[in-house]
C-alpha cells in the first residue's frame, strides 16, 4: 500500500474512484452488447416465447451486472498497471499515476466493488446466470498480467467480453444446458474484441515498445492491418453462422450484418499508423457499431418474437 504525497489540491478521491471504474466513459457498453446478443440468439435458437416486461427486467439485470463487473475489474486493472501507466502518454492522467487517488484507496474501492457485483448479479439475475459470469470474473482477474507474459493479451480480453454471451443466453433459457450452441456467437464476439482492441493498442505502440508491454500491435508492427483483415472476415463469417443457426430474419441480415460488413473494410482502410489518435477513433467507432447491432438485434427480437406473440394473443382474445 502507498500513501499519497500529492498535494490535496490535486487529489480528488471521489472522482478517482469514478474514473478508475471507467464510469466517465462508454467502455462498459462493450461488455453489455454480447450479453444482449446472447439473449437474442437464445430466444431464436430455443424458439422461446417472450413477454415484454420480463425481458426488460432481464435487460436491466444484465446491464447492472455487467456494469458492476466492468467497474470492479477496471479498478483492479489500473491498480496492477499503475507503474506502467506512468510511462504511457495516454495513461499518465489516469487517477493512480496522476496522484488523484492513492493505491490504498483504490484497493478499498476494488474490494467494495466485489460484493456489489455479486449482490447485483444474484439479486437481478439469479444463481444460474451468476454461474455463467464465473469464467468472466476469473479471466478478468488474470488479464492485467497477460500483457507482461504473452504477445497476444487481446485474446484473453476477447474471451472475457465474449464470455458475456453466456450469461445472456442463460438469462433466456434458465439453465446451463446446450451452451455449446452459443459458441459461434462467443467466437464471433471474441474475434471482434481482439479486432477493436488491436486498433486501440496502436495508440500506445511506441510507449509499449519502450517499457516492454506486449500486444498484437507491438508484435506485428506495420503488418497489423493483415491481422485486422483476417479478424474482420472471421467475425463476419461467425456472425453469419450464428444468424443462420438462430433462424434470424432479414431485419438482422440486412440492417445488422449488412451494415457491419460495410464498416469492417472502412475501419481497416481508415487506420493511419502515423497518427496516434487514429486507432482510438476507430475503437470509439466500434462502440457505436456494437450499439447499432444491439439495437437491430432487439428490433428483430421484438418484431419476430414479442410482437408476433402479442398479436397472436390479441387474436385469441377476440375469438
Swiss-Prot record:
Membrane topology: Multi-pass membrane protein
Transmembrane portions of the chain: 28-45, 48-68, 106-126, 127-147, 152-172, 182-202, 224-244, 249-269, 289-309
GO molecular function, one term: transferase activity, transferring alkyl or aryl (other than methyl) groups
EC numbers, comma separated: 2.5.1.-
Intracellular or extracellular location(s): Membrane
Function: Polyprenyl transferase; part of the gene cluster that mediates the biosynthesis of macrophorins, isoprenoid epoxycyclohexenones containing cyclized drimane moieties. The first step of the pathway is the synthesis of 6-methylsalicylic acid (6-MSA) by the polyketide synthase macA. 6-MSA is then converted to m-cresol by the decarboxylase macB. The cytochrome P450 monooxygenase macC then catalyzes the oxidation of m-cresol to toluquinol.
Pathway: Secondary metabolite biosynthesis; terpenoid biosynthesis
GO cellular component: plasma membrane
Species for this entry: Penicillium terrestre
BP GO terms, sorted: terpenoid biosynthetic process
Family, as annotated: Belongs to the UbiA prenyltransferase family.
UniProt name for this protein: Polyprenyl transferase macG
Note in the entry: The macrophorins cluster contains a single gene insertion (encoding for the terpene cyclase macJ) compared with the yanuthone cluster that produces the linear compound yanuthone.
Enzyme class: transferase
Species lineage: Eukaryota, Fungi, Dikarya, Ascomycota, Pezizomycotina
Gene behind the chain: macG
InterPro entries, alphabetized: Prenyltransferase (IPR039653), UbiA_prenyltransferase (IPR000537), UbiA_sf (IPR044878)
Stored CDD domains: PT_UbiA_COQ2
Keyword Transmembrane: yes
Pfam family, one: UbiA
Keywords from the named record: Magnesium, Membrane, Transferase, Transmembrane, Transmembrane helix
Cofactor dependency: Mg(2+)
Coiled coil, from the record: none
